[in-house]
Amino acid sequence: MPASSIDSDQFRRILSRNVAMPLGMGVLSALVFVGIIAYLINVLSWVEHSERVIGRANDVSRLSADMEASMRGYLLSGDREFLDPYTLARQRMGGDLTNLARMVDDNPAQLDRVRRIRTAQNEWELYAEEAIRRRAREADVVDLVKSGRGKNLTDEVRRQFAQFIEAEDSLLQERNSSSRNVIGWSVASFLAFSLIVAGLLAW
């Protein structure tokens, strides 16, 4: 075989070893790294989502508490200025619960809890409207308050909110744990892959 042919074959092998292989491994390493980062971002986005859901649920829960406190203040004083927070909160409540439902529409269990919150809140609002009408007519509201119906309805609203937030907090803890695990195995996997690539290039 002519020497030039041998030299050409050797040159191609050297070129493949010193240029093509490192370039291919570099591209493969980049793809692996991008895949790991994309997966990690996805996991962290769900953590952030749960945090937003919990924050929104707490806001809506406070809105409900403001309505209850405002209504109680009016029943005690008869001053309609006490109803301003109640009126404003009532105008927002329906829309805020709808937005909360949209945030968890991928989770049937949480979506059902929002429906139960809405039902409990609507029942309380019916009671509140009845109490406010009685007070406006200067009718006796003592018996209505003493019946305990308002307290029971308020407790039910709070219980439903607490169950929703507790369930979402459990999801948050699971997702936080998952994100830590992903970070751990991602770093270990990438280091192992890098060592394998380095070994192949050195071989």
Predicted regions mapped to residue ranges:
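Amphipathic alpha-helical segments and their boundaries
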Residues: 15-67, 103-121, 182, 186
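Juxtamembrane amphipathic/coiled-coil helical coupling segments that flank
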Residues: 3-11, 36-48, 68, 128-191
